[in-house]
Amino acid sequence: MINYFFIFLVPSLGMVAGLSVAATVTVFLLISLLQNIAAWIPNRHCEEQSDVAISLNILRLLRQLFCNFLAMTIKTELLFAGWCLISCLFAIKPINSLINFVQVFTILFLGFVVSNFKPFQNRPKLKKALIFGTLTGILLFFVEYFSYGFLTRIFKANFNLYMLDRGCALLSITAWVVIAILIYDKKYCPALILYILVLYLLSISDSLASFLGFSLGGIVFILARFIKPIFSKLIIFGLITGSLLFPIIAGQINPKGLSDKYLTTHPSAAHRLFIWHFVANKIAEKPLMINGFNSSKYTQVKDSEMIDYKGEKWHPLPLHPHNNILQITLELGLIGLALFLSLVYKYLKQIGNIGNDNFRASSYACFINYYIIGMISYNVWQIWWIASSIWVLILMKLLVKPDIVIDK
């Protein structure tokens, strides 16, 4: 019953309160962990037996979890986590970086552990809960959009469309799980209608990153479905090459010229160009330098480096670079970037090994959707955004995958 509640709650509440994902997913992970521990504890038939039996079963569970952890082939993940931890020692504010590190990698650890548990029971009902939760999230968006924030204004003084950006990002990646479920059930028309509905929703939202990510996800789905013999190699080469070239390109662009020509009515997008250009030049000065985990917001900026654009003063690095590649390179250096791209390569290879064509295509689409949003928006280490990725991973592995013969 608890699983139904959370699987419905995360996408629905997440639409109007995106940051809630950090709390709801964390609680969901903890409850799942406790449920699996409780399953190993025998019923208390008699008091003499219970304490010993409980202790033995807990030890067996811990042993199984440890063995599963070792069997997860997470050497690259451990190297990356270790490098992030080392970077905290060289951070501008070491204590803050260490606290952020513990928060991020605690939820990642919980997510990886729970994702290797047994598949969910009563999956048909859980799938319905996810579909209803996603549709409720879509309905809440349109309620807010056409009522100018009726629900939001109950709790806040005013409403702006950008307040739904996080909810739109969550919807864009969760929708791929629902699409995978509908396709597996041979409900192709509802799957297509859902894609078009979400695409339309994102097009009228203020979340350009989610719209681009979901649009490219659709293109990737089609390509992965119809040119499967070479698609795996193409996407790995394209994504890693593009990621490596991005800091170079960002350092060479003329942000003012591009903004004047293409982004006169999109100040937020124009500001992104100035941020990327500034961060890329900072990286070029000392490419091996480690600024520390999640330390972008503490980067010192001179008065002469402030941006003066059309009479407005913009900060060249407000909080974070709004690009996962630039942020990781700035904070962790080229070694950190190499480890991060090794993870990207590993996960794309794992997706490429999925035997079921539709599930593989949905997984590629979801991965690209998440990656593209990270290339345009959000701090790569934001808890709610990390929790969103863990949420989708668990749904794919424990809710969708068990009903499909997928691994070669």
UniProtKB/Swiss-Prot annotation:
Question: What is its membrane topology?
Answer: Multi-pass membrane protein
Q: Where is the signal peptide?
A: none
Spell out where the chain crosses the membrane: 5-25, 72-92, 94-114, 130-150, 163-183, 192-212, 230-250, 325-345, 359-377, 380-400
State the InterPro entries in the record. Answer: O-antigen_ligase-rel_domated, WaaL-like
Name its cellular compartments.
Answer: Membrane
> What GO cellular component entries does it have?
membrane
| UniProtKB keywords | Membrane, Transmembrane, Transmembrane helix
Principal localization? membrane
Record-stated family:
Belongs to the O-antigen ligase family.
> What name does UniProt use for this protein?
Putative polysaccharide ligase RBE_0399
Q: Which gene encodes it?
A: rfaL
